[in-house]
Amino acid sequence: MSQGIEFNRLMMDMKAMQMDAMSKPKSTSAVPEVAGSNFSDMLGQAINKVNDTQQASSQLANAFEIGKSGVDLTDVMIASQKASVSFQALTQVRNKLVQAYQDIMQMPV
C-alpha cells in the first residue's frame, strides 16, 4: 500500500515540476549565453600550467644534481617527461591555432 502512495506522490511532484517548467518564460535571444571562462582565459591557464610543470621539473633536477636527500632519479625522470609531454602538447595546440588563423585569413570575403 505504501508503494502506491509513494508512486502517487512522485507523480504529483513530477506534474508540479512540469507546470513550473511550462510557466517559465523561454529565452528568445539569438546570442547564446556563455557560461564559464572564455577561450583566452583557458589558454592562459594551460600555458601557466605548462610553465609550472617545467619549473617544477627544473627544480627537481637541480635538487638531484646537488645531491639533496629525498630526491630520487625516477622522480626526476618522471617530472622531466611530464614537462616534455605537456610542452609538446602546447606546441601542437599552437600549431593548430596558427593553421586555423591562416585558413580563416585565406577565405574569400
UniProtKB/Swiss-Prot annotation:
Q: Which InterPro entries match?
A: FliE
Q: Where in the cell is it found?
A: Bacterial flagellum basal body
Q: Which Pfam families match?
A: FliE
Which cellular component, as a GO term, is one annotated location? bacterial-type flagellum basal body
**Which BP terms from GO are recorded?**
bacterial-type flagellum-dependent cell motility
Keywords of the record: Bacterial flagellum
Q: From what superkingdom does this record's organism come? A: Bacteria
* A molecular function GO annotation: structural molecule activity
Q: Which NCBIfam families match?
A: fliE (TIGR00205)
So what family is this one in?
Answer: Belongs to the FliE family.
What this protein is called in its record is Flagellar hook-basal body complex protein FliE
Q: From which source organism is this entry?
A: Pseudomonas fluorescens (strain Pf0-1)
